């Protein structure tokens, strides 16, 4: 499904946080290459009235020899299980084919973990309004013993990471399928 590449790079740097004695900075980086879904989701046009992530693409194939930027919505693939389609049509809550799972970084202070997990799970109400139960869950990231394949750098896992910082904010970048806007992974 994916390839993970980790590497250490050293660059010339004259300003902090460089090593002033050597004039360099060394960074450990991780890159993921992921196989996209065989069947892309149907694209949905972005609506300015809805505050959400969008992807702009330039269409050069217009007949009048001009280009046009089109915005598409980035979103999760929430699909009804085949056996639950009739229930869904009747307005009953159903579980999606694939849950949205956010793993909480094991470096997170222990006293905060239950609240972070509850914060993720509090989104259940929004997904229930769309007809899905248990669509999103928060859980503690597995240990190496529990899942030797798990890595917070791996593009297959959405992670809420703890990074001590004096800056009081959070960031939520995500990886999405450029063909459809399907969110494949997100980190907070």
Can you say where each PLM-predicted feature lies in the sequence?
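Auxiliary tRNA-acceptor-end handling modules of aminoacyl-tRNA synthetases
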Residues: 1-108, 126, 130, 135, ...
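Alpha-helix N-cap/helix-initiation motif
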Residues: 109-113
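Solvent-exposed, polar/charged alpha-helical surfaces in well-ordered, non-transmembrane soluble domains
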Residues: 114-121, 125
């Amino acid at each position: 499904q994916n390839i993970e590449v980790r590497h250490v790079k050293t660059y010339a740097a004259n300003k902090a946080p460089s090593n002033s004695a050597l004039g360099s900075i060394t960074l450990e980086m991780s890159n993921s290459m992921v196989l996209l879904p065989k069947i892309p989701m149907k694209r949905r046009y972005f609506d300015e009235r809805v505050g959400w992530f969008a992807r702009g693409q330039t269409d050069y194939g217009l007949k009048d020899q001009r280009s046009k930027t089109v915005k598409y919505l980035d979103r999760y693939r929430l699909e009804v299980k085949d056996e639950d389609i009739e229930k869904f049509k009747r307005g009953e809550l159903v579980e999606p084919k694939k849950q949205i799972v956010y793993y909480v970084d094991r470096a997170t202070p222990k006293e905060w973990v239950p609240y972070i997990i509850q914060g993720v799970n509090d989104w259940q109400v929004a997904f229930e309004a769309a007809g899905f139960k248990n669509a999103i869950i928060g859980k503690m990231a597995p240990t190496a013993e529990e899942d030797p394949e798990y890595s917070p750098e791996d593009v297959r896992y959405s992670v809420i990471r703890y990074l001590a910082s004096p800056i009081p904010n959070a960031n939520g970048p995500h990886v999405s399928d450029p063909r459809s806007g399907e969110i494949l992974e997100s980190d907070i």
